[in-house]
Regions:
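Bacterial Sec-exported substrate-binding components of ABC uptake systems
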Residues: 1-71, 182-222, 333-339
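A short, structured surface patch at a secondary-structure boundary
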Residues: 65-121, 125-126, 130-134, 251
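Alpha-helical, coiled-coil/dimerization segments enriched in small aliphatic residues
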Residues: 232-259
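Short helices/loops that flank or line small-molecule/ion binding pockets
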Residues: 114-125, 140-143, 262-271
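Short helix-initiation/N-cap motifs at beta->coil->alpha
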Residues: 47-49, 105-116, 136, 255-263
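Extracytoplasmic ligand-binding site segments that recognize negatively charged/polar headgroups
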Residues: 90-92, 132-140, 150-182, 215-238, ...
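Structured C-terminal subdomain patch of bacterial secreted/periplasmic proteins
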Residues: 170-179, 254-255, 274-339
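Second-shell loop/turn segments in exported
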Residues: 58-59, 105, 129-132, 165-170, ...
């Protein structure tokens, strides 16, 4: 059986077209992406436990990676962006609801974001996250940016939770909604944020209503990468809510972290019935599938024996506006596999 590949972006495009949310957005600001005049500012938001006050909306935001960039696009905030940083291994950007926003926004680099790039772009805010751009080992942190007068907004999925460098402080979909509301407040587009959240909540509820339940729920493992030790999702990364709300039993739900590594022996012990492959990078989804199928320790794992492998795009699985569509997509795949 070939891996199931479902274009979740098409599900998302359909949902946004029905609601009027997405690349084309109208709102009380007149639909031009600029904040309304008046007494909205200053505003205070809480981001990863830190309260920050802004006297005006940032005008030259630099985003890092596809999910973060598309959060801005989903809110219609491309006119507030100096550009984005993203490798070119994150799928077909021409097929997403925000293709026009991609075309009008500068792709600053396909390599790693850094302080020099932010300075060259004259950024007033960098929207990234821990291990989504910010990294002490590389010397690129919010504290370093603050020294040169550049603000930061941390992706909520990446918030550190006090256990060393473990990440995650709330359920993944809640993290998405928190960021939409925070950015809605910061850029004075609260109505847009609430409309998107309502659309996503409706989409998730409809998918859950059709999802497998009870004893029919298959055990599901998310495979990102890695041969010696697999990189996977814990309870605080997007796949946890995507798998759970799609009608699966996430086998790594007890890991109180976001993206993390485990041992293959743990995977074998938990015997997933379905494996979801995260499709991105230099190693293709088919190459990942062939590795899983040929790796001797996995030979007796149910998902491998029955060839139950699903493929989702990277942007479906990290925190992004594509998460609700990925739930609907995976729910349909799980029903098909169980049928």
């Amino acid at each position: 059986m070939p891996p199931l590949v479902r274009p979740a972006a098409l599900v998302l495009a359909a949902a946004l077209a029905v609601t009027g949310c997405g690349a084309e957005v109208t709102s009380p600001d007149g639909g031009d992406g600029r904040p309304k005049a008046g007494g909205h500012y200053p505003v205070t938001i809480e981001n990863c436990g830190e309260k920050k006050t802004y006297d005006a909306a940032p005008e030259r935001v630099v985003t890092n990676d596809v999910g973060i960039t598309e959060i801005m696009f989903a809110l219609g905030l491309e006119d507030h962006m100096a550009g984005y940083v993203m490798p070119d291994d994150k799928g077909d950007l021409a097929a997403v609801p925000w293709k026009d926003a991609y075309q009008k926004t500068t792709w600053l680099s396909k390599k790693q974001i850094n302080k020099e790039l932010a300075l060259d772009a004259r950024a007033d805010l960098v929207f990234a996250g821990w291990n989504y751009g910010f990294n002490e080992g590389e010397g690129f942190t919010p504290a370093e940016l603050e020294k040169v007068g550049i603000g930061s907004y941390l992706l909520t999925e990446s918030c550190r939770n006090g256990r060393a460098k473990a990440r995650g402080v709330m359920p993944p979909l809640e993290a998405l909604y928190v960021d939409l509301r925070n950015l809605g407040t910061l850029f004075d587009v609260e109505d847009r944020a609430e409309a998107l959240i309502a659309t996503f909540q409706k989409q998730v509820a409809e998918a859950q209503a059709k999802a497998l339940k009870g004893a029919d729920r298959p055990r599901v493992f998310l495979y990102d990468a890695g041969r010696d030790r697999p990189l996977t999702s814990g309870a605080y990364a997007g796949p946890h809510d995507i798998i759970t709300k799609a009608g699966g039993d996430h086998v790594m739900k007890d890991l109180k972290d976001s993206w993390t590594t485990v041992g293959w022996e743990t995977v074998v012990e938990r015997d997933p019935e379905v494996i979801v492959i995260n499709d991105y990078g230099d190693v293709s989804a088919e190459q990942k599938r062939q590795f899983l199928k040929s790796y001797p320790p996995l030979a007796n794992v149910s998902a491998i024996k029955h060839d139950r492998i699903v493929v989702l795009d990277y942007a479906d699985l990290v925190e992004s506006p594509r998460n609700p569509a990925a739930i609907a997509s995976l729910a349909a795949d799980l029903r098909k596999l169980k049928g």
